[in-house]
Curated annotation (Swiss-Prot):
Compositionally biased residues, Polar residues: 379-388, 552-569
Residues with PTM Phosphoserine: S384, S387, S521, S581, S584, S775
Free-text note on domains in this protein's UniProt record: The ANK domains are required for interaction with RAB35.
Main location: membrane
Organism encoding this protein: Homo sapiens
Name this protein carries in UniProt: Arf-GAP with coiled-coil, ANK repeat and PH domain-containing protein 2
Post-translational modification Phosphotyrosine, affected residues: Y742
Membrane topology: Peripheral membrane protein
Record-linked InterPro entries: ACAP1/2/3-like, AH/BAR_dom_sf, Ankyrin_rpt, Ankyrin_rpt-contain_sf, ARFGAP/RecO, ArfGAP_dom, ArfGAP_dom_sf, BAR_dom
Record-level Gene Ontology MF annotations: GTPase activator activity; zinc ion binding
Length: 778
């Protein structure tokens, strides 16, 4: 090892030694600056490299997304996937290179600066200190007078000790300098050599990777050449076709006038028509119309679900309209509404009218089940019947209201005469009927029975689930409880007079209902059969403020679902397994224990039985209470004059509310606090119930004793869904008032949004649970 500073000169402490030290110290200082700069540049390079890797990964993800987008093109998908995988390997190689760079350059050089240079600086400080002490000792020794022997000896001793210490520290300092000068060469070369080997490994790995990819790239290049040739050929063909088409006469749309009743895809005719809106402005909008499956439907965009104009063409007529200013207009009239349409020309108008008339005639000739009809709210796109959507395919394959209702026990035959395959229903009773019995039910009046067709009418989701929750077996156990005891035989199909007498005795006179005695007045019964804890729990609902009540409902987790579909307590039947309500499945233990205090329903007043059963979501018991004469609007004076409908809201069941409303419940009847069902549903965050009550005419302007209407409660609770529904209903109400007595029932936007909320509340209630889930977080 070549010495930078000589040890002999060190002992002499000569000017040559001091000059050598000064030179070495300056060199070390400059070395430290260079190394610090190199380390900082290395760190910046590594950070930039990591950022490059991150950006490169994002670029690779973009290539993969493009490959997935090109899934229909095997060549593009395969090549992009293969290239992205190879480039991902290169990113991994880059990551390894940066890690090795960090270890070889940054870590090693930083360690050299922090360890070796620090030792040098420490030795320098000690040397400078002892040098200063030596100089002081020499000066003091020179200044001592001869006649002061004691001071002479003391100065001599200090000088001797200081010189010895100086020589020792100076030798250590010189050794540290020489070692540092030697080590810096090895450290710098070692780190740079490691760095170069890292690059060698990086490029070698990249070479191996692309050597394997090379043959595929050559094949792809040859294939690309063929694709370019094919593309040029296709371009020439399209240019020729374009030139040929340009020579045709497009002055008329005769090519679009054809319709085919026997079309393979079921579409008789389709094309653009102008449709007059039902809003206040009576605007005309251009929509894509089609006639298919004996229905007239339209849509705005291809991805939109078609809106059904006419459910069944057999129930409508079509006629020319010459009494309005716009040309080429015709009107499609059904029993419930009419639709004004406008074609682009007289030929197109005649073609559409003829297509509708032909479809009507064809519909009358056809036989069989109508299960392939489009559903008004979730029918598949007219142009995408093969889109692969399972739920839409199910509807096309026959999962209709008829099938879903008839699969309930007892519903496969008429509830009153036993005739098979009934296609009518009484929606407030929850039973299926044959066509003859349905006519008799109509004659009873809607206060006894509301009749609807299972095949021709539109079924709202909550009403369909109500039908699935009851059924002929459940209702007959109530209304035919004493038929066998009384020795009465049910009428047979075809016996019109016997049927009429039997049905009137069954539902109007209720002769066959099992009568039970009522020995207690309603207040006495409540005091006897309702525990104090139960009353406190029930009444505590009304003591909360809007915010507290929402949090309480979220904590109890008993009302976290608005669907209202629950298991019947009689037979445990789950009406619609895909949308079982969490209300009936997760009821708190305390409330179940209190509900057991109600004991046998035979000991309850019918009104109180209906009241309790509404909270328990027990539809069979509710039907039994109504059969025994319960007032559907009975108010419980012991519990704030709450009604069965309010109890159904507190119980969290949408179907229970629907059942009470179908049987005449007053949607605006309020308790002593001035809160109606809409208030309670808003406070609890039950979006599905709010939607149902607004559709049934609930007064959202009514205020409670605190002066709050449902909208202000929803705004305070920050429930966006309910605020949207209330404001939309209020806007629709104002629009109807502005149109006067003969205005339309509401614009299409209002109807579409409420239809969507009804669908979600019944079929996807978890989508409306956002408010409860957010409340649980707090």
């Amino acid at each position: 090892m070549k010495m930078t500073v000589d040890f002999e000169e060190c002992l002499k402490d000569s000017p040559r030694f001091r000059a050598a030290l000064e030179e070495v110290e300056g060199d070390v200082a400059e070395l430290e600056l260079k190394l610090d700069k190199l380390v900082k540049l290395c760190i910046a390079m590594i950070d930039t490299g990591k950022a490059f890797c991150v950006a490169n990964k994002q670029f690779m993800n973009g290539i993969r997304d493009l490959a997935q987008y090109s899934s229909n093109d095997a060549v593009v998908e395969t090549s992009l996937t293969k290239f992205s995988d190879s480039l991902q390997e290169m990113i991994n190689f880059h990551t390894i290179l940066f890690d090795q760079t960090q270890r070889s350059i940054k870590a090693q050089l930083q360690n050299f600066v922090k360890e070796d240079l620090r030792k040098f600086k420490d030795a320098k400080k000690q040397f400078e200190k002892v040098s200063e002490e030596k100089e002081n000792a020499l000066v003091k020794n020179a200044q001592v007078q001869r006649n002061k022997q004691h001071e002479v000896e003391e100065a001599t001793n200090i000088l001797t000790a200081t010189r010895k210490c100086f020589r020792h520290i100076a030798l250590d300092y010189v050794l540290q300098i020489n070692v540092l000068q030697s080590k810096r060469r090895s450290e710098i070369l070692k780190s740079m050599l490691s760095f170069m080997y890292a690059h060698l490994a990086f490029f070698h790995q990249g070479y191996d990777l692309f050597s394997e990819l090379g043959p595929y790239m050559k094949d792809l290049g040859a294939q690309l050449d063929r694709l370019v040739v094919d593309a040029a050929k296709e371009k020439r063909e399209m240019e020729q076709k374009h030139s040929t088409i340009q020579q045709k006469d497009f002055s008329s749309d005769d090519s679009k006038l054809e319709y085919n009743v026997d079309a393979a895809n079921g579409i008789v005719m389709e094309g653009y028509l102008f449709k007059r809106a039902s809003n206040a402005f009576k605007t005309w909008n251009r929509r894509w119309f089609s006639i298919q499956n004996n229905q007239l439907v339209y849509q705005k965009k291809f991805k939109d679900n078609p809106t059904v104009v006419v459910e069944d063409l057999r129930l409508c007529t079509v006629k020319h309209c010459e009494d309005i200013e716009r040309r080429f207009c015709f009107e499609v009239v059904s029993p419930t509404k009419s639709c004004m349409l406008q074609a682009d020309s007289e030929k197109l108008r005649q073609a559409w009218i003829k297509a509708v008339q032909t479809s009507i005639a064809t519909a009358y000739r056809e036989k069989g089940d109508e299960s392939e009809k489009l559903d008004k709210k979730s029918s598949p796109s007219t142009g995408s019947l093969d889109s692969g959507n399972e739920s839409k395919e199910k509807l096309l394959k026959g999962e209709s209201a008829l099938q879903r209702v008839q699969c309930i026990p007892g519903n496969a035959s008429c509830c009153d005469c036993g005739l098979a395959d009934p296609r009518w229903a009484s929606i407030n009773l929850g039973i299926t009927l044959c066509i003859e019995c349905s006519g008799i039910h109509r004659s009873l009046g809607v206060h006894f029975s509301k009749v609807r067709s299972l095949t021709l009418d539109t079924w709202e989701p909550e009403l369909l689930k109500l039908m699935c929750e009851l059924g002929n077996d459940v209702i007959n156990r109530v209304y035919e409880a004493n038929v066998e005891k009384m020795g009465i035989k049910k009428p047979q199909p075809g016996q019109r007079q016997e049927k009429e007498a039997y049905i009137r005795a069954k539902y109007v006179e209720r002769k066959f209902v099992d009568k039970y005695s009522i020995s207690l007045s309603p207040p006495e019964q409540q005091k006897k059969f309702v525990s104090k804890s139960s009353e406190e729990k029930r009444l505590s609902i009304s003591k909360f403020g809007p915010g507290d009540q929402v949090r309480a409902s979220a904590q109890s987790s008993v009302r976290s679902n608005d669907s209202g579909i629950q298991q019947s307590s009689d037979d445990g039947r789950e009406s619609l397994p895909s949308t079982v309500s969490a209300n009936s499945l997760y009821e708190p233990e305390g409330e179940r224990q209190d509900s057991s205090m109600f004991l046998d329903s035979k000991h309850l007043n019918p009104g109180l039985q209906l009241y309790r059963a509404s909270y328990e979501k027990n539809l069979p018991k509710m039907a039994e209470a109504l059969a025994h004469g319960a007032d559907v609007n009975w108010a419980n004076s012991e519990e704030n004059k709450a009604t069965p409908l309010i109890q159904a809201v507190l119980g969290g069941s949408l179907v229970t509310c629907e059942f009470l409303l179908q049987n005449g419940a007053n949607v605006n009847q309020r308790d002593v606090q001035g809160r109606g069902p809409l208030h309670h549903a808003t406070v609890l965050g039950h979006t599905g119930q709010v939607c149902l009550f607004l559709k049934r005419g609930a007064n959202q302007h009514a205020t409670d004793e605190e002066g709050k209407d449902p909208l202000s409660i929803a705004v305070e609770a920050a429930n966006a869904d309910i605020v949207t529904l209330l404001r939309l209903a209020r806007m629709n109400e104002e629009m109807r008032e502005s149109e006067g007595l003969y205005g339309q029932p509401g614009d299409e936007t209002y109807q579409d949004i409420f239809r969507d909320f009804s669908q979600m509340a019944s079929n996807n209630p978890e989508k409306l649970n956002r408010f409860q889930q957010d409340s649980q977080k707090f």
